[in-house]
């Protein structure tokens, strides 16, 4: 039997799926812990958006994107905060577009 030093991986990494509303703020819960890194991607929708990454070292008001080789970028309405069971997003289309766009968060 394989050995893993992590008994319960979902205590450290979890995936959530949510539907955008376009309304800010939108709380995303059910993660099970306060994330240190949030990776969000529009999963279902007619427009394609880059993967958007934020971490607690840079702070929620900065992001990295996977479609650019640029440095971190200031973000004012993407990720708004982290909570004990998830995170809160603003109304930016990268993270919360209305019309039933579906997003995946890691």
Where are these regions (language model features)?
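Surface-exposed molecular-recognition determinants
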Residues: 1-106
């Amino acid at each position: 039997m394989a050995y893993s030093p992590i008994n319960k991986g979902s205590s450290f990494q979890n995936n959530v799926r949510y539907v955008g509303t376009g309304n800010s703020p939108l709380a995303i819960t059910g993660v099970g812990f306060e994330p240190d890194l949030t990776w969000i991607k529009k999963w279902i929708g007619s427009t394609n958006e880059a993967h958007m990454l934020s971490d607690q070292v840079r702070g929620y008001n900065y992001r990295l994107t996977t479609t650019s080789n640029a440095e971190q970028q200031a973000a004012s309405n993407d990720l708004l905060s982290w909570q004990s069971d998830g995170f809160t997003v603003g109304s930016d289309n990268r993270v919360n577009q209305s019309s039933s766009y579906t997003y995946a968060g890691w």
